[in-house]
């Protein structure tokens, strides 16, 4: 019985120590990330839009993966 009690106490102590270590970690907020980065919000937004639009442009220029070209369908 005493071995089981000691084991439980050790496990609880390890759990408490782990939880305390996790809470002490510094978490960076999105505001701090924006402040740290040198690019403005407009630049980031335009890069995000280009990342979405570029695959669509490529898809219109050449057939999308899994699709045949219009000339092949006729």
Curated annotation (Swiss-Prot):
Major location category of this protein: secreted
Positions of the propeptide segment: 22-33, 69-74
Subcellular location: Secreted; Target cell membrane
Expression (tissue specificity): Expressed by the venom gland.
Gene Ontology CC annotation, any one: membrane
Function summary: Possesses antimicrobial activity against both Gram-negative and Gram-positive bacteria, as well as against the fungus C.tropicalis. Also possesses a relatively high hemolytic activity. May act by disrupting the integrity of the bacterial cell membrane.
Name of the protein in question: Antimicrobial peptide HsAp2
């Amino acid at each position: 019985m005493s071995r089981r009690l000691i084991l439980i106490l050790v496990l609880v102590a390890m759990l408490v120590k782990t939880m305390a270590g996790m809470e002490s970690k510094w978490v960076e907020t999105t505001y701090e990330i924006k402040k740290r980065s040198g690019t403005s919000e407009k630049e980031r937004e335009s890069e995000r839009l280009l990342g979405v639009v570029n695959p669509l442009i490529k898809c219109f220029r050449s057939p999308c993966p899994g699709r045949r070209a219009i000339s092949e369908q006729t």
